[in-house]
């Protein structure tokens, strides 16, 4: 599975204007949180500038980033939220995770059908699993349909297992 590389994440942060060094003391929790907030704010600046522009779609990043990159980014942002307690990003996380679900709540949205593969879908399912692990609040419109982050991840897993084909491609 492809992942967002350190280079890709660094490029995304730099494209938001983060070109100066960040003052960081890795032995000081407050310093780590402050440095993390700077990086997160810059990443979200790129994301928000794209999604709030005409034609922007919640959960997607601008070119050259792919759909799975956004899924991996949100997975990381969920962990940041859980470790930092930064509640300001919860609506952004929820919006992205829900908008990219697709009509069957399985991270197969019609707007990604041209290039969607198991690895891409799994990137988003892993973000949903992390959301479940860290108790990211589930939006009421999902809860009212008995849908949780864990049930979404489970749905994707079951769909991918059902697609497993050892006959034509060795699995």
What are these regions (language model features)?
Residues 22, 128-131, 135:
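Short, helix-capping/interhelical loops that line the mouth of catalytic, cofactor-
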Residues 4, 137-144:
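Short, flexible/disordered intra-domain loops and linkers
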Residues 1-25:
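Fungal secretory targeting signals
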Residues 81, 85, 132-139:
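Short coil/turn linking the two alpha-helices of tandem helical-hairpin repeats
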Residues 115-128, 152:
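Mobile, glycine-rich extracellular loop/lid and propeptide segments
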Residues 77-80, 127-131:
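The core hydrophobic/aromatic register in alpha-helical repeat solenoids, strongest
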Residues 20-111, 144-170:
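Low-complexity, Ser/Thr/Pro/Gly-enriched N-terminal "stalk/linker" regions
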